[in-house]
Structure formats: structure tokens, C-alpha cells
UniProtKB/Swiss-Prot annotation:
Database matches in InterPro entries: SAM-dependent_MTases_sf (IPR029063), TylF_MeTrfase (IPR008884)
Catalytic reactions on record: desmethyldescarbamoylnovobiocin + S-adenosyl-L-methionine = descarbamoylnovobiocin + S-adenosyl-L-homocysteine + H(+)
Active site: E72
Pathway listed: Antibiotic biosynthesis; novobiocin biosynthesis
UniProt KW keywords: Antibiotic biosynthesis, Magnesium, Metal-binding, Methyltransferase, S-adenosyl-L-methionine, Transferase
Name of the featured protein: Demethyldecarbamoylnovobiocin O-methyltransferase
MF terms in GO: metal ion binding; methyltransferase activity
Keyword tRNA processing: no
EC number(s) on file: 2.1.1.285
Length: 262
């Protein structure tokens, strides 16, 4: 697959500088935000640039944990669909503090795009406890035990959008468990689908309900493909079931994406 052509990015140096800085602020690299005290990547809470770039820690205060490389990937994908007029909205399923969606809205603002919506889908209660009947890999990860860090309220996410002056009518929230909200989500067409649900069930629910809405030429981004085995299982099974052969492209140690070609 050919590299993404950054058509829109090259048209306005002011917007490029704005987005360059926004990415650094969202990830907390510009002020070296330390890791959360319950950080999983190293034993202390010190800020480590190489870890933050790869999205391998939980920041104490920054508005995203996905790191610089995955934020840049969002920018590349969104600017590509803008530059090539790929129809559809933008969505992230599983938003934590909202940083990835804030970047999506910032990109639309930077390029004066007014006919696309950013959809913010999350339980706003953290990771579900799948129970004994749930997928074995989901039970093994037991991420609900980390909800003291992973659960972020809708009001906090809205406040984060507001602090960037980006909470407006082009941002819509879908609060609730994906199995309940996504089947009836009022989304017609998607240009970028970003999944960060971690679990098999969350990933499967997202693909089942939203992948058919992704335009040809649009992008599917999987945040935890190489970090969370159940997420990878769901993606691989869905792609096999529906004969999706589009190339999976690596973003960093954890994330992948593909461009829909048919």
C-alpha cells in the first residue's frame, strides 16, 4: 500500500503548526507530564520520552495515553480523507480522557471542515466486567480492575473539549456500552473509524455495527491490536469472516490501521 498522501496538511502552514503543538499538548510531552502512579510500563512515575512517544504509559494528566505516533497517525488519516474527499464522519470507540477525539475535531477546525461530525463513543464508566460467560481472553485481562484509572466521566471529557475551545455542534457523544449504543447510533457514513475498546467483545461490537459504514478510501485504526490479544482476535476473526484483505499497517508497537479498498 502506498504511503498516505498528506494533501490537506501541506496547504496551510498555520494549521500545521497548530496541529503540531496540539499533539504535543494532548500527549503531555510539551510539559513532560509524568506517568500515573498506577502506570504499567515502568516501576516509577517518571516521564520517559521514548515511552510516551509509543503510548506505553498512562499519563498522570495528559488527555490521551496513545502517544505521539498514534496521534500522528490520526492526523494523517483524517487529513487524507479531507484532501481526497472521502465522505463520512469520524468516530472513536473508547475515548478515555478524549484526546484522540479532540485532535480529530482540531483537524476539522484547522482545515475549516464544517460538514463532518466527530462521534465520541464510550461507556464513561470504564471497562466492563465481562463475567464468567464472557470471552476468555477478556476475563484473563480483567481490565475492569483498573477502572480507577480507566473510567473517565462524560463531563470530564466534555470539559477537556471545552478547554481547547472545541466543544460545539460538530461533536456528538454516544454514552453507554457499545452493545447497547452502536446498533442504533445515528451515524450514516464514516471516513475514519478508530477503535480503542481493548476487549474482544468491545472490538467485535464496534466492527459489526460500524465497519459497514466506513467509506471506500476511509480508514480503520485499531489502537491495541498488538497490546491486547482479545482485541487482535476480534479483528482477525472479523476480517477473515468478511474476506477483508486490505493490508494491516503497523503504527508503533501496539497500533495498526488499514484503508478500506472495497
Amino acid at each position: 500500500m502506498a504511503p498516505i498522501v498528506e494533501t490537506a496538511k501541506e496547504t496551510n502552514s498555520d494549521s500545521s503548526l497548530y496541529l503540531d503543538l496540539m499533539i504535543k499538548v494532548l500527549a503531555g510531552t510539551v510539559y513532560e507530564d509524568p506517568a500515573h502512579r498506577e502506570n504499567f510500563s515502568h516501576r516509577d512515575s517518571t516521564y520517559r520520552e521514548e515511552v510516551r512517544n509509543e503510548g506505553r504509559d498512562w499519563p498522570a494528566n495528559a488527555h490521551t495515553m496513545i502517544g505521539i505516533k498514534r496521534l500522528e497517525n490520526i492526523r494523517q488519516c483524517v487529513e487524507d480523507v479531507i484532501g481526497n474527499n472521502v465522505p463520512g464522519d469520524l468516530v472513536e470507540t473508547g475515548v478515555w480522557r478524549g484526546g484522540a477525539c479532540i485532535l480529530m475535531r482540531g483537524i476539522l477546525r484547522a482545515h475549516d471542515v464544517r460538514d463532518r461530525t466527530v462521534w465520541v463513543a464510550d461507556s464513561f464508566q470504564g471497562i466492563p466486567d465481562v463475567g464468567e460467560d464472557g470471552y476468555a481472553g477478556d476475563r484473563k485481562m480483567a481490565l475492569h480492575r483498573r477502572n480507577s484509572v480507566l473510567a473517565v466521566s462524560e463531563e470530564e471529557v466534555r470539559r477537556n473539549f471545552r478547554n481547547y475551545d472545541l466543544l460545539d455542534e460538530q461533536v456528538r457523544f454516544l454514552p453507554g456500552w457499545f452493545k447497547d449504543t452502536l446498533p442504533t447510533a445515528p451515524i450514516d457514513t464514516l471516513a475514519v473509524l478508530r477503535m480503542d475498546g481493548d476487549l474482544y467483545e468491545s472490538t467485535w461490537d464496534t466492527l459489526t455495527n460500524l465497519y459497514p459504514k466506513v467509506s471506500v478510501g476511509g480508514y480503520v485504526i485499531v489502537d491495541d491490536y498488538m497490546m491486547c490479544p482479545p482485541c487482535k482476535d476480534a479483528v482477525d476473526e472479523y476480517r477473515a469472516k468478511f474476506d477483508i484483505a486490505d493490508e494491516l499497517i503497523t503504527i508503533d508497537r501496539d497500533g495498526v490501521y488499514w484503508q478500506r479498498t472495497r
